[in-house]
Amino acid sequence: MATLKDQLIQNLLKEEHVPQNKITIVGVGAVGMACAISILMKDLADEVALVDVMEDKLKGEMMDLQHGSLFLRTPKIVSGKDYNVTANSRLVIITAGARQQEGESRLNLVQRNVNIFKFIIPNIVKYSPNCKLLVVSNPVDILTYVAWKISGFPKNRVIGSGCNLDSARFRYLMGERLGVHPLSCHGWILGEHGDSSVPVWSGVNVAGVSLKNLHPELGTDADKEQWKAVHKQVVDSAYEVIKLKGYTSWAIGLSVADLAESIMKNLRRVHPISTMIKGLYGIKEDVFLSVPCILGQNGISDVVKVTLTHEEEACLKKSADTLWGIQKELQF
């Protein structure tokens, strides 16, 4: 007796389903799910896989997204605790990690996350040996180094979300001050994602007009308009959002989808993201920091050589020394 499906549909060929544009997200917390919805709404993948250790939450998030399939153009959304669901991914985004406990030192948090990465990374490598790794978990620069060391991947394929969001926050705040859309406000925040990031004031411009040329005090303590406060707001903004709602999610999710788009579509756009910076700016250690990188289908193919002031370069070097101080203590 023919089934309803057989009566309705005549099959013409036996297909083997191998995804061409698969994206995996590891960790289905607030950040992971914000990445997932942002990626789904940009139609970047033909399959999205979610992985986590919390099975009920994982299944619930998967089902909730699947129920929105009519409104999306991603035909397959899967999940599992077992990494076999991640097979054949082009891009794997890692948002999983331990949350900082009150009073916990950053070094202790890092070591806890290293232990988590020691489980995650080999599983990803096993099922998607040719993927790009995009690390979002904090502290992102150190964990990108950890992912690079554990994976054995070439450095172009291990990317940290870095200062992509810091720079976006900066451009938003700059736009608010000037009454101009952030897309038309240009400015770069480089270095370590977080407290010691470096705003490159010399490059801040609208329509190619340098703000520093118009207003030489820009970004200095002598500045009557206190533009330096804009960078301080960028540094403090995550803490403020966490204090108000408990975590950050939407902006980082959108920022990650922006990076995913450059990779999946081979756009070769320039982003301030974390890459192995050894050999640049007099840095001699294996540290990952954000510099402007050309991002495409092979990950980071090139970096843009930014002209920094002596102070800016010194800040970058200081960040590198701090990171190396932590990295050399890590137990793999």
Curated annotation (Swiss-Prot):
Xref: SUPFAM superfamilies: LDH C-terminal domain-like, NAD(P)-binding Rossmann-fold domains
> Where does it live in the cell?
Cytoplasm
The entry's keywords: Acetylation, Cytoplasm, Isopeptide bond, NAD, Oxidoreductase, Phosphoprotein, Ubl conjugation
**Residue numbers of Phosphothreonine PTMs:** 309, 322
- Glycyl lysine isopeptide (Lys-Gly) (interchain with G-Cter in SUMO2) crosslink: positions? 57
Does the record carry Chaperone as a key word? Answer: no
For this protein, the Enzyme Commission number is 1.1.1.27
> Sorted alphabetically, which Gene3D superfamilies does this protein's record hold?
Lactate dehydrogenase/glycoside hydrolase, family 4, C-terminal (3.90.110.10), NAD(P)-binding Rossmann-like Domain (3.40.50.720)
Q: Which residues bind substrate?
A: 106, 138, 169, 248
Q: Which domain of life is it from?
A: Eukaryota
Q: Which residues does UniProt mark as catalytic?
A: 193
Q: How is it modified after translation?
A: ISGylated.
Is-annotated flag, keyword Iron-sulfur?
Answer: no
Residues carrying N-acetylalanine: 2
Q: Where is the signal peptide?
A: none
NCBIfam families, alphabetized: L-LDH-NAD, PRK00066.1, PRK06223.1
Q: What is this protein called?
A: L-lactate dehydrogenase A chain
Species for this entry: Bos taurus
Q: What is the lineage of its organism?
A: Eukaryota, Metazoa, Chordata, Craniata, Vertebrata
